Amino acid sequence: LENRDDVDPERIGIIGLCMGGQQVWYAGALESRLKVCVIVCGTSTYEAMVLEMAPYHSHCLFTYVPGILRYGDTQDILALIAPKPLLIMNNYNDTWFPVSGYKKVCEELEAVYSAFGAPERFEHIIRDTVHDITPEFGGEARKWFEKWL
């Protein structure tokens, strides 16, 4: 991508929905060429996902990294993205990514971004909507990319 004539390698961002959002966790943390990250309906703590989601969506537990809770949880992975701009959006009724874990992740990331002196580079939005990149979420993502790229 960065070698294309129509791409500015200093202006590459990433967005992901659901499991694609989980891919943003790792890509954003590990790939320095990504300048901005957006996650849609793809964030909660592993703890909440395992305890609250498993009875409904046990087929999705393949996203769980065995043994990870001995070392940390979702917020610890996402903290590695800082201080890059990160926007996380979720919905209140998301059974795939429980709100209890989403709130914990966001609270901890607010502290991380503040410690970096960059609280404006982290934002989270939660709405009463569906598990999708809705027009509202898509518009918010577009504004975030335009602001930071």
Model-derived regions, located:
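Gly/Ser-rich "nucleophile elbow"/oxyanion-hole loop immediately N-terminal to the catalytic nucleophile
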Residues: 1-18, 34
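Short beta-strand/loop motif that positions the catalytic acidic residue
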Residues: 81, 88-90
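Glycine-rich nucleophile elbow surrounding the catalytic serine of serine-hydrolase chemistry
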Residues: 16-26
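Conserved hydrolase catalytic core segment
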Residues: 29-35
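Alpha/beta-hydrolase-fold catalytic nucleophile elbow
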Residues: 15, 40-41, 89, 127
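C-terminal catalytic histidine-bearing segment of alpha/beta-hydrolase fold enzymes
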Residues: 61, 107-149
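Mobile cap/lid helix-loop segments that gate and shape the active-site cleft of serine hydrolases
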Residues: 35-78, 83, 96-106, 114-118
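Acidic catalytic loop of the alpha/beta-hydrolase fold
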Residues: 92-97, 131-132
